[in-house]
Amino acid sequence: MTEKLYEVDSYVQNFTAQVVSCTPVPGGFAVVLDRTAFFPEGGGQPCDTGRLGGARVLAVHTDGETITHTTDTPLTAGETVDGCLDWPARLDAMQQHTGEHILSGALHRLFGAENVGFHIGSPYVRMDTSIPLTQEQLAQAEAEANAAVRADTPVHCWVPDPETLARTDYRSKKELTGDVRLVEAGGDCCACCGTHLARTGEVGLIKIISFAHYKSGMRLAVACGQRAYDAVAGIWADTEAAWRLLSSPVGSLTPALERLQNGEAALKARLAALQNTLAAACAEAAAPGAPAVLWVDGADGDGLRRVAMAITAKTNAPCCTLGPGGQGLAYALAAAPGGDVRETCKALNAAYQGRGGGKPGFCQGSLAEGSFEQVKAFLLKSLT
């Protein structure tokens, strides 16, 4: 049985312990100590890393009451070693874990949402809820959670006796038996084996970075503490850059983007009208009944499609339009009424390092090799 120093004081960074055993295992050595401050992976929280004497601690696991440290070099059974945690990593895990408890508690109190999944990953914490939530509900829960952070109240970790536990209202993902460790933080009470901060104020900030519907509920990406500060600072830097690019005053990004979006829609409509005019002019000049291959300068993929379809409708014959595209040529290939150009498209791609495809009546793609004259000769031979 390993004495768990982190359960008594989660701020222990350095300690001494006696090596109980050391066994070679794949990837290192399995070391058991009589006592440890290293937290083993579990409950969504990653394990601690650091050093035991001259050995690096690579991973920490538990199989009940015994905690095993995987090290890169062996230790000697019976020797006394000094343990040292990677403190910045542990402090980060504590900020994320305590922050998650506070936010989960707010979601539960306000909307009855259960936390059904939790993992401290990188760069964000993943939280899964049992029910769908709106953006407004998430914002409300985030605000309440940060109010609890600002209140800077104590975080209490304890193991109540069975009678006290029976009359205590607490959150838990599963039914528990035996000793149950509870963590009270920011008005929330939850069963938890992890390490936590001493006060809610040490969390600093809780920020929901993104959210999406997942299964029957929501999946949230959350940042707490330094991670939240870094995320907000990064978002603010992007926002400042957008203000400058749009020549928009501070605080007016949304109206500027709406103007940009409306202007883009107007330009797209104007471009479509011009491409229709071009398509009609090209169709007017086309010879009825004859396959056509022509160069259309300045047209995008949609423009090439419009011209090819207009000519085919006029001539009742297949037509291929080509124009500049990336490092080569872009093409749009329209079949005569009732025709199928898929085999021609396949052969064209094979001959000129092309990519693309489509339906029997129309195919579209790009060619990495071949000049317009070469492709034109190939197509006229294939379409005739």
Residues of each region from the PLM?
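A generic structural motif
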Residues: 30-31, 64-73, 125-131, 331-332, ...
